[in-house]
């Protein structure tokens, strides 16, 4: 298929606001694709060249893109810069400059060229990337050029995520949207959307019956529900239950296939290179040939005090020093870590997601030998809520976040990608009267004054309305930031500034920020009360006013979460209603 048809669809989708209409248009497009076009297009719709667990960055920033655009269209870089300053979008600049009326570019041509740019590395790679980019722009029509530039820069900005695509797959490949729920479940296990699209195109609805976990391809993490009190725990989890320490670190999945070992973050990113000591110790202490483990990496050290060995857990912020590509050995010494495994998902050819938690825990203990770095989560098994409360208090004294209480029932399966009713978390903030922390998406910022001049004064934050797959504002956050926090947030937001309310974001007129931010950055916030508010759009309906979070205070950036992992409108409303 010609790339022109995909570019024209992108243009249509950018202007379409109806959820149903977006899904319909995408499904019609996929019905007409053949062979590798299905897989390639699935990636392109998400502005990528592969799944999240591959390094899909093309390595081209604005400066190189300006050079490529100038070279492609025979204009000066200064001309491109001026047009960019006016439009705020290098894709629009390419659209303005391109004079080509006809193009023979196919989807495969464009996808392969993007792969070529991505895989070019080493000495002279910047010049080669620029030449490859410039060359394909010369062959493209204005519409094609606009979206090629956006794809190269990773700024497609269609205003929707993977859930729209999965609903479209249901219609295109099974003929009925009712299969969307099963397809979404399958996507939690097969997190490669291109591979999933290919399997569905070839097998239809029956494909969801044989998609399974595969070592080397991370699954979406199972998450915990929230409870209001220890008494509620007793109602939610009958009989015997396990209480495990909850660590304030980075969620990790470790996949071992023979000598090959990889670590993946909650966002499914490959973080293997950041934690070489964990990879080394897994190789020594985990004898299984094929295994997938779920755990938490924490900044941690064992120290000796007064002749006693004690565990020292350091704040999550310390761990962020390890999120780097360079000076790994230096920061390995500065910030020692341990990984606490609490689940096993696959073992020597056998998927374990449908095995109950007690069986999985037994297999975990049989297949992981603890070392200084490789640990198993500490836990108690009891029917007594009083014992669980005592265990919780012990974890807080150790400097931990709290506990996770897990069902021991015969159907306590690992529910990938779900906030499961088999796991419940209880954190220190809850016992202090702060019922919840909120993972919110930044959608705007307000200019700072005084010591914050030149930075933001407050951030406009939103929650996810899952039904409409849009972001609705909940609060403005202006306290809790250190100078280092503000600097890091400014850096993260700078790539996502747009000139108008981003598509898929709902903001009231009286709440309009000075700067609009497309949904990309997630922050964790502590708040004291949820109230009704006509000023915010979270949960607003024909008969319901919006919701607002009062007295929010910034806690940290959630590098491990995507906007679609943020708190939902339903979760906020449930907290307000006490359900």
From Swiss-Prot:
MF term (GO), any: metal ion binding
SUPFAM superfamilies: ATP-dependent DNA ligase DNA-binding domain (SSF117018), DNA ligase/mRNA capping enzyme, catalytic domain (SSF56091), Nucleic acid-binding proteins (SSF50249)
InterPro entries: ATP-dep_DNA_ligase, DNA_ligae_ATP-dep_bac/arc, DNA_ligase_ATP-dep, DNA_ligase_ATP-dep_C, DNA_ligase_ATP-dep_cent, DNA_ligase_ATP-dep_CS, DNA_ligase_ATP-dep_N, DNA_ligase_N_sf
Gene3D superfamilies attached to this UniProt entry: DNA ligase, ATP-dependent, N-terminal domain (1.10.3260.10), DNA ligase/mRNA capping enzyme (3.30.470.30), Nucleic acid-binding proteins (2.40.50.140)
Any one GO biological process: DNA biosynthetic process
Keyword Membrane in annotation: no
UniProt keyword terms in alphabetical order: ATP-binding, Cell cycle, Cell division, DNA damage, DNA recombination, DNA repair, DNA replication, Ligase, Magnesium, Metal-binding, Nucleotide-binding
Cofactor list: Mg(2+)
Enzyme class label: ligase
Matches recorded under PROSITE patterns: DNA_LIGASE_A1 (PS00697), DNA_LIGASE_A3 (PS50160)
Stretches that traverse the bilayer: none
Catalytic residue list: 246 (n6-amp-lysine intermediate)
Pfam families tied to this protein: DNA_ligase_A_C, DNA_ligase_A_M, DNA_ligase_A_N
Sites where the protein binds ATP: 244, 251, 266, 296, 342, 419, 425
Record's catalysed reaction(s): ATP + (deoxyribonucleotide)n-3'-hydroxyl + 5'-phospho-(deoxyribonucleotide)m = (deoxyribonucleotide)n+m + AMP + diphosphate
HAMAP family: DNA_ligase
NCBIfam families: dnl1
Described function: DNA ligase that seals nicks in double-stranded DNA during DNA replication, DNA recombination and DNA repair.
Family of the protein in this entry: Belongs to the ATP-dependent DNA ligase family.
Name of the molecule in the record: DNA ligase 1
Source lineage: Archaea, Methanobacteriati, Methanobacteriota, Stenosarchaea group, Methanomicrobia
Gene: lig1
């Amino acid at each position: 298929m010609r790339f022109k048809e995909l570019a024209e669809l992108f243009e249509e989708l950018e202007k379409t606001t109806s959820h149903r209409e977006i899904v319909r248009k995408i499904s019609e497009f996929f019905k007409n694709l053949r062979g590798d076009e299905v897989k390639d297009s699935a990636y392109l719709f998400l502005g990528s060249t592969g799944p999240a667990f591959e390094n899909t960055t093309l390595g081209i920033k604005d400066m190189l893109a300006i050079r490529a655009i100038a070279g492609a269209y025979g204009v000066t870089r200064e001309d491109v810069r001026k047009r960019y300053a006016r439009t705020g979008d290098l894709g629009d600049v390419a659209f303005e400059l391109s004079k080509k009326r006809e193009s023979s570019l196919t989807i495969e041509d464009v996808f392969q060229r993007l792969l070529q740019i991505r895989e070019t590395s080493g000495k002279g790679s910047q010049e080669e990337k620029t030449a490859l980019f410039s060359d394909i722009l010369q062959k493209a029509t204005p519409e094609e050029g606009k979206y090629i530039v956006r794809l190269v820069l990773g700024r497609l900005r269609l205003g929707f995520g993977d859930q729209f695509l999965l609903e479209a797959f249901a219609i295109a490949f099974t003929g009925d949207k009712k299969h969307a729920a099963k397809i979404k479940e399958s996507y939690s296990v097969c997190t490669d959307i291109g591979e999933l699209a290919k399997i569905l195109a070839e097998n239809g609805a029956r494909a969801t019956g044989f998609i399974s976990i595969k070592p080397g391809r991370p699954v979406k993490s199972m998450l915990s529900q929230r409870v209001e009190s220890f008494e509620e725990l007793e109602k939610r989890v009958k009989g015997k239950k396990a209480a495990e320490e909850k660590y304030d670190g980075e969620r990790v999945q470790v996949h071992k296939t023979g000598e090959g070992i990889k670590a993946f973050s909650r966002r499914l990113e490959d973080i293997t290179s950041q934690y070489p000591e964990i990879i080394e110790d897994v190789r020594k202490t985990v004898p299984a040939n094929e295994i997938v483990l779920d755990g938490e990496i924490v900044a941690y050290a064992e120290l000796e005090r007064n002749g006693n060995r004690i565990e020292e857990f350091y704040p999550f912020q310390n761990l962020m020093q390890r999120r780097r590509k360079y000076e790994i050995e230096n920061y390995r010494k500065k910030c020692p870590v341990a990984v606490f495994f609490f689940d096993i998902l696959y073992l020597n050819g056998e998927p374990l997601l449908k095995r109950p938690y007690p069986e999985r825990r037994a297999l975990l203990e049989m297949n992981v030998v603890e070392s200084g770095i490789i640990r198993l989560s500490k836990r108690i098994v009891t029917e007594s809520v009083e014992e669980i409360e005592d265990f919780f208090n012990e974890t807080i004294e150790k400097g931990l976040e709290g506990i996770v209480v897990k069902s021991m029932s015969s159907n306590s399966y690992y529910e990938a990608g779900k906030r499961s009713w088999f796991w419940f978390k209880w954190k220190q903030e809850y016992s202090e009267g702060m019922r919840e922390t909120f993972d919110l998406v930044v959608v705007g910022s307000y200019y700072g004054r005084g010591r914050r001049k030149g930075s933001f004064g407050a951030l406009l934050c939103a929650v996810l309305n899952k039904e409409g797959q849009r972001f609705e504002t909940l609060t403005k956050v202006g306290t809790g930031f250190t100078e280092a926090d503000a600097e890091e947030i400014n850096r993260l937001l700078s790539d996502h500034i747009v000139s108008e309310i981003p598509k898929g974001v709902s903001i009231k007129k009286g709440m309009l920020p000075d700067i609009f931010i497309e949904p990309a950055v997630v922050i964790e916030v502590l708040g004291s009360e949820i109230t009704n508010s006509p000023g915010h759009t979270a949960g607003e309906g024909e008969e319901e006013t919006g919701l607002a979070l009062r007295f929010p205070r910034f806690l940290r950036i959630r590098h491990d979460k995507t906007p679609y992992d943020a708190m939902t409108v339903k979760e906020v409303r449930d907290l307000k209603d006490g359900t």
